[in-house]
């Protein structure tokens, strides 16, 4: 079905508004057909080589941030295989992501399109300067350089961001953790063979905290020897998987997934480039996703129980407040070329915080496990 058949003007922003309404109302087929194409067109508006008013042709050099036709076809094929409920969440997240500034993480205000196709708020432009008062801007997403005199105001994206902001309450409701995700919950345990020697693990392999005394464990190739972290089991190669971690009163933690092949020796750096897709709590309440650079996150309340949903087919990993169901963050383009493992790192601040990370029992198990207490160790 073409947009013209419904009597709507065939412009990227009007298509996206129609898609957004379709997502909110539950009409998936129509929304799925247009949403990726619409958002890519809007993001490209104002990039050199495209007429920001009448469209026109792109230059023969496609900006690296813009999806190619092959990329769009692949995303569309993946969406076709999803259930309506899952697609609705994916589409809502895509709209929210497309209308957010990668610098300040807020809704775009007076968005400016860089040469690579990314858009940032006008007020955030100066923060991308490579040098003080310089003319070169370094994109925080693509690491490509744009000249100040080449950036353009993206008015279509500005109108769309304003429209999405008005519908934020409905989008938030869609992005809440769907209870049906729990049908993919896994009976996860901690892999003691990967645990740093300063970690204390409960006998049931479900709770972990940092200790001050080094444990006498066997020196194994899979063990983290410097960074205080641990992996979970099982390993994931396909399918969808959900688990929850009780972070309690911990003041610092890292949770997520990583490639099975990540380096275990020496001090590790948690970045997506090195195979870690994690959310971190630092400085008594600062939440961030370990992108490059960091993506700072804002939640309505302190997280105490974190839900993690891994979709190997869609190459996504999403984080939720498992108590309220609120969406926290979604990593996209998560590598599925090798097995992924759950990743946990409890707090190790100088004040000796005894924060415990506990894997929550399966919702239908009817049992609970006490977290490890000070003095207990494996």
Curated annotation (Swiss-Prot):
Residues 168-362 form the B30.2/SPRY domain. It comes from the Eukaryota. Seems to be expressed in prostate and less abundantly in adult brain, fetal liver, and fetal kidney. Keywords: Metal-binding, Zinc, Zinc-finger. GO terms for cellular component: cytoplasm. One of its GO terms (biological process) is regulation of gene expression. InterPro entries: B30.2/SPRY, B30.2/SPRY_sf, Butyrophylin_SPRY, ConA-like_dom_sf, PRY, RDM_domain_RFPL, SPRY/PRY_RFPL, SPRY_dom. The keyword Zinc applies. A zinc finger (RING-type) spans 101-143. GO terms for molecular function: ubiquitin protein ligase activity; zinc ion binding. SMART domains: PRY, SPRY. Gene3D superfamilies: 2.60.120.920, Zinc/RING finger domain, C3HC4 (zinc finger). PANTHER family: E3 UBIQUITIN-PROTEIN LIGASE TRIM. This is Ret finger protein-like 2. It comes from Homo sapiens (Human).
């Amino acid at each position: 079905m073409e947009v013209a058949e419904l009597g709507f003007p065939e412009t990227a922003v009007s298509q996206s508004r129609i898609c957004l309404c379709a997502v909110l109302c539950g009409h998936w087929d129509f929304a799925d057909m247009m949403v990726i194409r619409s958002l890519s067109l809007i993001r490209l508006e104002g990039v050199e080589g495209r007429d920001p008013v009448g469209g026109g042709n792109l230059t023969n050099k496609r900006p690296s941030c813009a999806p190619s036709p092959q990329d769009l076809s692949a995303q569309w094929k993946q969406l076709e295989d999803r259930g309506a409920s899952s697609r609705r969440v994916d589409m809502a997240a895509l709209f929210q992501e497309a209308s957010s500034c990668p610098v300040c993480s807020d809704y775009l205000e007076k968005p400016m399109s860089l040469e690579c196709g990314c858009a940032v708020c006008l007020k955030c432009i100066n923060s991308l300067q490579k040098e003080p008062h310089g003319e070169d801007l370094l994109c925080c997403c693509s690491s490509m350089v744009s000249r100040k005199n080449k950036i353009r105001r993206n008015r279509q994206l500005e109108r769309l961001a304003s429209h999405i902001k008005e519908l934020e309450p409905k989008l938030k409701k869609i992005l809440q953790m769907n209870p049906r995700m729990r049908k993919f919950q896994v009976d996860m345990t901690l892999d003691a063979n990967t645990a740093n020697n300063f970690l204390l693990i409960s006998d049931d392999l479900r709770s972990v905290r940092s200790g001050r005394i080094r444990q006498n464990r066997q020196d194994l190739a899979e063990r983290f020897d410097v960074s205080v972290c641990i992996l979970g089991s099982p390993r994931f190669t396909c399918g969808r998987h959900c688990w929850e971690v009780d972070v309690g009163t911990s003041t610092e933690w890292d949770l997520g997934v990583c490639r099975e092949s990540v380096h275990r020796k020496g001090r590790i750096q948690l970045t997506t480039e090195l195979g870690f897709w994690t959310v971190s709590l630092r400085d008594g309440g600062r939440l961030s996703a370990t992108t490059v650079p960091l993506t700072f996150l804002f939640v309505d309340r302190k997280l105490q129980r974190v839900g993690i949903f891994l979709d190997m087919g869609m190459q996504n990993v999403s984080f939720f407040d498992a108590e309220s169901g609120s969406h926290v963050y979604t990593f996209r383009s998560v590598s599925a070329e090798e097995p992924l493992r759950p990743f946990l790192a409890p707090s190790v601040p100088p004040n000796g915080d005894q924060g415990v990370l506990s894997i929550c029992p399966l919702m239908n198990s009817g049992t609970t496990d006490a977290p490890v207490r000070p003095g207990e160790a494996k």
